[in-house]
Each structure stands twice: as structure tokens, then as C-alpha cells.
A protein has these predicted regions:
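Nucleotidyltransferase catalytic core that binds NTPs
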Residues: 1-172
Length: 172
């Protein structure tokens, strides 16, 4: 948060995007896991705004909902998601509502040149990420194989996944 000078961080679990298969956890379960993960951080707010919305989940709609004249929104994305920005729904309007911060994994350079050419009004900043190399796919794969995930998610989230047998987590 300090790197981007943020006063607050809003974590917004998304509905199933139109381009992805249905999730293995319900909206309520995903919301609960995010709330558990964010509980220790008072400046992190969890919003169910996308989960309450009917129809497809588009980032531009969420940005419009959160935009006010007195705040600067920052959309934080991983490099994999940021690379697809030009094909997002109403991508050319993203810069009207936010700037984009791309979390760049150490050793994985992210070239934003093409994005800047296609979306010239979008301000993009890159933030080096030295944290744990995590992917939702790796978490689901480990769960399905009965392997521990405590090194990838907070302990309370790992417990929740195990208790609710999500992502193929074995039953006791």
C-alpha cells in the first residue's frame, strides 16, 4: 500500500468472468475466504459489489461504481491479467476511472509498450513483486492432490478450504 500511497485497499471477488469456466467454490465461499485472508489488515476492505451484480462481470462497471470525484482509483493486476487489458470490455475507457499498477514478478519482465500504444490514456506503473510466487491454479492443484497449501494462503483460509472440501481437498 505504501508503494502506491494508498489510503485503503478494496478487495473485490469477481463473479465468474465471461471468458472463464464456472469456479469450484461458490460466490459465498470465495467471499468468506477473502474476508478471512483480509481480516488482519484494517485498511483492506472487502466488497461484494461484483458478486451482487447480475450478468457478466466487467471491471469497467466496478470502476464506475467506485469512482468519485475525490478519489484516485488504482487497479492492481498481475502481469498475466495486465497483458490482456487491450481486449477487455470497454478497455479504452479504463483510463477515465483508474490507473493500473502491474505487480511484476522478479525475473519475469513485463513489457507494457503494446498496451500503452493501444490504450494511450491509461496510466500504467509497474511494481516489482518479491513475494511468494502464487497462482490460483497451483493452489487448486495442490488441493486436488491432497498436498498442503499453508505456504500459499493464510492458515485460516487453508483450514476453510479443507473443512469445506474445496478444490478437491480430501475429506477427513
Amino acid at each position: 500500500m505504501a508503494t502506491l500511497s494508498l489510503d485503503q485497499l478494496s478487495i473485490i471477488p469477481n463473479r465468474t468472468p465471461p471468458h472463464k469456466p464456472a469456479p469450484q467454490a461458490s460466490d459465498a465461499q470465495r467471499m468468506q475466504m477473502v474476508q478471512l485472508a483480509c481480516a488482519p489488515y484494517p485498511q483492506w476492505q472487502v466488497s461484494d459489489s461484483e458478486l451482487r451484480r447480475s450478468g457478466p462481470s466487467y471491471t469497467i462497471d466496478t470502476l464506475r461504481e467506485f469512482a468519485t470525484p475525490h478519489n484516485q482509483l488504482v487497479l492492481i493486476l498481475g502481469a498475466d491479467a495486465a497483458a490482456l487489458l487491450p481486449v477487455w470490455y470497454h478497455a479504452k475507457h479504463l483510463g477515465e476511472y483508474c490507473m493500473v499498477a502491474v505487480m511484476q514478478r522478479i525475473g519475469s519482465p513485463f513489457d507494457d509498450q503494446q498496451i500503452r500504444q493501444q490504450l494511450p490514456n491509461l496510466v500504467i506503473t509497474q511494481i516489482p513483486w518479491a513475494g511468494i510466487d502464487i497462482s490460483s491454479s497451483a493452489i487448486r492443484q495442490r488441493c486436488a492432490q491432497g498436498e498442503p497449501i499453508n505456504d500459499l494462503v493464510p492458515a485460516n483460509v487453508a483450514d476453510y478450504i479443507h473443512q469445506h472440501h474445496l478444490y478437491g481437498a480430501p475429506r477427513d
